Design a protein with these regions (language model features):
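Short, well-structured N-terminal submotif of metal-dependent ribonuclease cores
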Residues: 1-37, 51-66, 108, 122, ...
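Residue-level signal for well-ordered alpha-helical positions
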Residues: 16-17, 48, 89, 125
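Short, conserved active-site loop motifs that form the nucleotide-linked donor/cofactor pocket
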Residues: 33, 73, 125
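Phosphate/NTP-binding elements of NTP-utilizing enzymes
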Residues: 45
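Active-site neighborhoods of divalent-metal-dependent phosphate/nucleic-acid chemistry enzymes
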Residues: 57, 61, 69-117
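Short loop/helix-cap segments at secondary-structure boundaries that form the rim of catalytic
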Residues: 118-125
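Basic, glycine-rich
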Residues: 127-129
């Protein structure tokens, strides 16, 4: 499976793994699956750390580099096709990061791993729910 991690799933996988369901934990641990991360999630984490919403035991850039290596993360490209797909992403809330994740999952044919129920209601994207 080709899986795009929502930002909170990526963070929880290291900082709060108990928040992941056993199914999601098993699937993320399966080395046959590809784990993808959007640059938007990297930006979102940096913002959360700067605003003190997330606390890390090390520098944010070091944490990101370690996480990318530990999880064998692939970079999901922010392409023109993704930007163009954004116009079709309608969410109840206006979180631009979520819109980018949905558009990326659609364009790159990835399954979005999320606990966000709003994203679970979106048509045209495969979801692996963490609930």
């Amino acid at each position: 499976m080709r899986l795009l991690l929502d930002t909170h799933i990526w963070i929880w996988s290291d900082l709060e793994p108990w928040r992941l369901t056993s199914d999601v934990t098993r699937i993320l641990s399966d080395t046959e699956n590809e784990l993808w991360l959007s640059p938007v999630s990297v930006w979102e984490l940096i913002v959360h750390v700067e605003k003190k919403r997330v606390t890390l035991e090390k520098d944010v850039l070091t944490w990101i580099a370690t996480s990318k290596q530990d999880l064998s993360l692939r970079e999901a490209p922010m392409s023109w096709a993704v930007a163009e797909e954004l116009r079709f992403v309608v969410l109840r809330h206006r979180d631009p990061a979520d819109r980018f994740l949905v558009a990326t999952a659609r364009v790159q044919d990835l399954t979005l791993v999320t606990a966000d129920r709003t994203l679970m209601e979106i048509d045209g994207v495969r979801i692996l729910p963490n609930c």
